[in-house]
C-alpha cells in the first residue's frame, strides 16, 4: 500500500502531496521536510529506493520534478516505480509533455488524474486508455456545465 505521494522540485518546493494514511498536519510537514532533504541530498547514480523508518521510499526524477512514494516494507519497489511512471504517462497524455508549471497552474487536474488512477493507496485503474477516457469525459462534462451556466435565462 502507498502511504503517501510527494512531488517536489529540485529546489525542494513541494508541488503536490497525497496522503493515504491519517497523520497530524505538524507530523506531515516534518515528514515532508525530512524526505525532501533526504532525497535531494542523494547522488544521481544512487538507488531510487531508501529504507526510511518503517517504510520504503521509492522515488524517480522526471525533468525538474521528483516523484516520491512511501510504501510498506513488503511492497514491490519496481511495481511502485511503474506506478510512478504510469502517473507521469497519464500527466503527459493530458498536458502534452508535462512540466513543473503544468502541475503548479493545474494542480486540481493533477490531483484528479492521481485520484482516477490511485484510490486509498492502491492502484485503481491499470488501463491507461480507460483512465484517459474518464479524464476526458470529466473535462467534457465540466465544459458542458460551464456552457449551460453561461446561457442567459429568459
From Swiss-Prot:
Q: Name one GO cellular component term.
A: clathrin-coated pit
Q: Which PROSITE patterns match?
A: CLAT_ADAPTOR_S (PS00989)
One of the GO biological process terms: protein targeting
UniProt GO MF annotations: clathrin adaptor activity
Alphabetized InterPro entries for the sequence: AP1_sigma, AP_complex_ssu, AP_mu_sigma_su, Clathrin_sm-chain_CS, Longin-like_dom_sf
**SUPFAM superfamilies registered for this protein in UniProt:** SNARE-like
Q: Which UniProt keywords apply?
A: Coated pit, Cytoplasmic vesicle, Golgi apparatus, Membrane, Protein transport, Transport
Where's it mainly located?
A: Golgi
Pfam family of this protein, just one?
Clat_adaptor_s
Q: How is the protein disposed in the membrane?
A: Peripheral membrane protein
Stated role: Subunit of clathrin-associated adaptor protein complex 1 that plays a role in protein sorting in the late-Golgi/trans-Golgi network (TGN) and/or endosomes. The AP complexes mediate both the recruitment of clathrin to membranes and the recognition of sorting signals within the cytosolic tails of transmembrane cargo molecules. Involved in TLR3 trafficking.
State the similarity comment.
Belongs to the adaptor complexes small subunit family.
SUBUNIT field: Adaptor protein complex 1 (AP-1) is a heterotetramer composed of two large adaptins (gamma-type subunit AP1G1 and beta-type subunit AP1B1), a medium adaptin (mu-type subunit AP1M1 or AP1M2) and a small adaptin (sigma-type subunit AP1S1 or AP1S2 or AP1S3).
Q: What is this protein called?
A: AP-1 complex subunit sigma-3
